[in-house]
Amino acid sequence: MTVLLTGATGLVGTRLLPRLVAHGVRCRTLVRGDNPLPDGVDPVRGDLLEAGALAAAVTGVSAIIHLAATFRTTDTDLIWKNNLEGSRNLIAATQANAPRARFIMASTAWIYADDAEHPGREDDPAAPTLDYPASKLAAENELRSSGLNWSILRFPFVYGDKDGHLESLTQLAPGRFHPAQRLSMVHHRDIAAAAILALDGTFDGRIVNIADEAPTSVYELVELVGGSMEPSSKPLTNPWHIQMDCSLARRLGFQPEVRTVHQAAQQDLL
């Protein structure tokens, strides 16, 4: 099996790629720079806006894992260009050059409504107003109507393997999150486990939420990495915001190896 991985040099991709290689997956990457890659990985130079590079990248692959995305920028045009137009280009290249390939797209828990009455479910109506989740939802819809063999994995707050993401909460959380807000979480190990299940066809034709077993308060997360946050007993605007219902994933066979962020801390996996 040869798999194309986009976003291989990003936060998730740099941790997923070596795990795929260790699992015996032959990997190809779409990269712009000269970042070091694991032995045996075949780089294709280019990006999601280059038709020639995309054709070369997808030709001969059995599957595509599409991680590449733009977020945490004020450049909304860039968000839409990369997340929607780039995804659309990759889908078109796959239709033309690898129509039987399995296409796995990474997406986000931010798609779910701010005022949800329960943890986000895959079949909930979604109409996000922020550009990042709105662009990801638009890309999801492009894939779902493409005629390809697709699956979509929605991830919540990703952490672990010393990626620095938890540490960033010490700067991001104050003023943005209520300290009692609980976030669904997923460790990089379990992203890899979900990706391998997707490559085997477990999630074909489905949107699937992938998270661990214990949404954790922002207050606890900040303290876990040595930060501090002003406590509050004020009511939460919506206690379900950024939480996901993962019942479907469990029914389909996904079980997180890292069940909680506290387990990760105890096992030095942060």
Across the structure, where does each feature detected by a protein language model lie?
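SDR active-site strand-loop-helix element
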Residues: 6, 30, 64-68, 103-109, ...
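Glycine-rich NAD(P)-binding loop of the Rossmann-fold in SDR/ketoreductase-type enzymes
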Residues: 49, 78-89, 130, 134-137, ...
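NAD(P)H-binding glycine-rich loop region in Rossmannoid oxidoreductase-like domains
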Residues: 35, 45-83, 111
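N-terminal Rossmann NAD(P)H-binding glycine-rich loop of SDR-like oxidoreductase domains
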Residues: 3-23
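C-terminal amphipathic/interface module of NAD(P)-dependent oxidoreductases
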Residues: 229-270
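Mid/C-terminal beta-alpha module of Rossmann-like enzyme folds, strongest
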Residues: 194-241, 245-246
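Conserved Rossmann-fold NAD(P)-dependent oxidoreductase catalytic core, especially the SDR/UDP-sugar
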Residues: 88-131
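NAD(P)-dependent short-chain dehydrogenase/reductase
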Residues: 141-189
